[in-house]
């Protein structure tokens, strides 16, 4: 492919509105352009990468018997009313009317559509299982689109749905998908973890998220690629190294989610779902009597603890939530933080939000800062974190402004439902007892759910089982964020390329180091002087030879300065660069391996053989 024929609008500078490196490089390297807020055009390079990823997916899904189809993006609202999600999905749902004033939506996901198609066509367990998927644009009216392709209003997604006559059959397909996802992301060159996830708006029960890890840019050996003009990092002057570190740190670490994972086992979970090892403790101290004490101007746990000279771990944090229009009191040990996802899941609530100051006063008779679990109205629902039951003679709010109660003992002074509703902390023991928890940022690239009968129940999708009984179809759901794969790969494979000029100056610039499976082309073939006929002829021969051996070749045939050509090549990030330069008449070309910065000169006749050796090594 001739570069002069492609739309690759590279920029000399990073875009000023980009906060994460993947967004900046996709724009600067000419992969994407923003058409409107949260809406992007995928230019030829991006489209080629996405198509390569689609090929990987299709190959792996064929192995597990998944069949591709295509559903409409424009959906009737009636289907979503059947499932109940038309009213509950929220403001992210694009709603519109046609000329007949009928309600439609732009699909953010397609559970209802696939359920309806199968409901109308499948009547017996003998017709199951079915394993269907599509690759299609989705739509979500994000309030604040950001970070390039990571949070957009239109995005490309692979969504799959499986249909079964029982849960045992679903378990088999779920495991097939889990293994297929691992194979897909491994082939794509991603550093990822499969973690325990939250079913969220999909209504799933068991679920697993696949997160592309976005580590901090502190490891110079990982993020910096040295040109052959620099022997090692030790040769770079200290002041230049400090500049490089500052440049690496200047870009925000992307990833919407925090992952908690064990240092010594396979345990990994989204922070929203992560738990830690818990060991109940026996009470050894005698229980004191309740005593009300004045705590003037103390509104926070640390202020109360300091005023009463107690540790924060001896205090009870009392919070009030409204769950599906019902008040729920949540209790934590004072130095812990609430995990609202755990609380919402435990309550099986559709809606959960913190109560207002006015609602707190109506319920407790006091404002925030003085709330507590003692002497609440009969029938009040109290959900306490499991650590609270270990407390003896704790401090809690007195439900009276400016006062607290000491000597509070769970069981004696209040009754509660005990469950894990706290946010874990880094360094705590893993729940399996092996290793401690560490945190990392991650980009969600895939998610699989066991939906069960959530949609078949609400939409009447039933079959006759082997005993002739009418039973709901059991479902699974499997998603991959196709467009955000591009962002995730660039986040992990962006590199700062450093070289030394003949004058001894050090220069550095960002570029992409694409893994071979997803690179838009395999080889960047550059002619230094397009007016040199010998070089042109050699380039044409090499292009033909490479293509005959199955290489995708991008040939830079532009009449541009060689510096511009090399800069664009570093930005675009193809794995191999072959330069036809001053030694073209001698039949000598230069090969450069992007991942390492290594380069060698070879006879053009030996190019293919040399590339085969080098690509095996790297």
Swiss-Prot record:
Pfam families: HGTP_anticodon, tRNA-synt_2b, tRNA_edit. Disulfide bonds: none annotated. Keywords: Aminoacyl-tRNA synthetase, ATP-binding, Cytoplasm, Ligase, Nucleotide-binding, Protein biosynthesis. Its main location: cytoplasm. GO terms for cellular component: cytosol. GO terms for biological process: prolyl-tRNA aminoacylation. Belongs to the class-II aminoacyl-tRNA synthetase family. ProS type 1 subfamily. NCBIfam families: PRK09194.1, proS_fam_II. Homodimer. PANTHER family: MITOCHONDRIAL RIBOSOME PROTEIN L39/PROLYL-TRNA LIGASE FAMILY MEMBER (PTHR42753), PROLINE--TRNA LIGASE (PTHR42753:SF2). Consists of three domains: the N-terminal catalytic domain, the editing domain and the C-terminal anticodon-binding domain. This is Proline--tRNA ligase. It comes from Streptococcus pyogenes serotype M49 (strain NZ131). The gene is proS.
């Amino acid at each position: 492919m001739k570069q002069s024929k492609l739309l690759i609008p590279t920029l000399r500078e990073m875009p000023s509105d980009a906060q994460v490196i993947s967004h900046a490089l996709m724009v600067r390297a000419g992969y994407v352009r923003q058409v409107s807020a949260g809406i992007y055009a995928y230019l030829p390079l991006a489209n080629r990468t996405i198509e390569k990823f689609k090929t990987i997916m299709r190959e792996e899904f064929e192995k597990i018997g998944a069949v591709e189809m295509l559903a409409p993006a424009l959906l009737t609202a009636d289907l979503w009313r059947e499932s109940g999600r038309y009213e509950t999905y929220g403001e992210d749902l694009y709603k519109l009317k046609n000329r007949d004033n009928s309600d439609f939506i732009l699909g953010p996901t397609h559970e209802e559509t696939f359920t309806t198609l199968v409901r109308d066509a499948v009547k017996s367990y003998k017709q199951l299982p079915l394993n269907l998927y599509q690759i299609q644009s989705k739509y979500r009216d994000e309030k604040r689109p950001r970070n390039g392709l990571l949070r957009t209003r239109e995005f490309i997604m692979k969504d799959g749905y499986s249909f079964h006559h029982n849960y045992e059959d679903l378990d088999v397909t779920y495991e097939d998908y889990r293994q297929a996802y691992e194979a897909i992301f491994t082939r794509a060159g991603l550093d990822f973890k499969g973690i325990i996830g939250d079913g969220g708006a999909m209504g799933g029960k068991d679920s697993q998220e696949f997160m592309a890890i976005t580590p901090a840019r502190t490891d110079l050996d990982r993020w910096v690629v040295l040109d052959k003009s620099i022997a090692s990092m030790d040769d770079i002057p200290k002041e230049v190294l400090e500049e490089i570190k500052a440049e690496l740190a200047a870009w925000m670490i992307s990833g919407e989610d925090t992952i908690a994972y064990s240092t010594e086992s396979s345990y990994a979970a989204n922070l929203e779902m992560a738990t830690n090892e818990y060991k109940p403790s026996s009470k050894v101290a005698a229980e004191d009597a309740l005593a009300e004490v004045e705590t003037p101007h103390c509104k926070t746990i640390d202020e109360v603890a300091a005023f009463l000279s107690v540790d924060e771990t001896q205090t009870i944090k009392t919070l009030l939530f409204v769950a599906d229009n019902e008040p729920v009191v949540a209790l934590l040990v004072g130095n812990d933080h609430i995990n609202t996802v755990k609380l919402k899941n435990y309550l099986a609530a559709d809606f959960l939000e913190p109560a207002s100051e006015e609602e707190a006063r109506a319920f407790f008779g006091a404002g925030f800062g003085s709330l507590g679990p003692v002497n609440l109205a009969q029938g009040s629902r109290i959900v306490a974190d499991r650590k609270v039951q270990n407390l003896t003679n704790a401090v809690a709010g007195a439900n009276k402004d400016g006062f607290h109660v000491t000597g509070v003992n769970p069981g004696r002074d209040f009754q509660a439902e005990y469950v894990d509703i706290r946010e874990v902390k880094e360094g705590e023991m893993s729940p399996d007892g092996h290793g401690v928890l560490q945190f990392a940022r991650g980009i969600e690239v895939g998610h699989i759910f066991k939906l069960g009968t959530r949609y078949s129940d609400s939409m009447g999708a039933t079959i006759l089982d082997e005993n002739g009984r009418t039973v709901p179809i059991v479902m699974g759901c499997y998603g991959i964020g196709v467009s955000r794969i591009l962002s995730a790969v660039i986040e992990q494979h962006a590199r700062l390329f450093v070289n030394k000029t003949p004058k001894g100056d050090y220069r550095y610039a960002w570029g992409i180091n694409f893994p071979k499976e997803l690179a838009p082309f395999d080889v960047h073939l550059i002619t230094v002087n397009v007016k040199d006929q010998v070089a042109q002829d050699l380039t044409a021969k090499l292009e033909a030879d490479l293509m005959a051996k199955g290489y995708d070749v991008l040939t830079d045939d532009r009449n541009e300065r060689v510096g511009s050509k090399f800069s664009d090549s570093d930005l675009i990030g193809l794995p191999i660069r072959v330069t036809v330069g001053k030694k073209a008449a001698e039949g000598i070309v230069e090969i450069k391996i992007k991942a390492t910065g290594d380069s060698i000169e070879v006879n053009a006749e030996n190019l293919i053989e040399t590339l085969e050796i080098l690509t095996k090594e790297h």
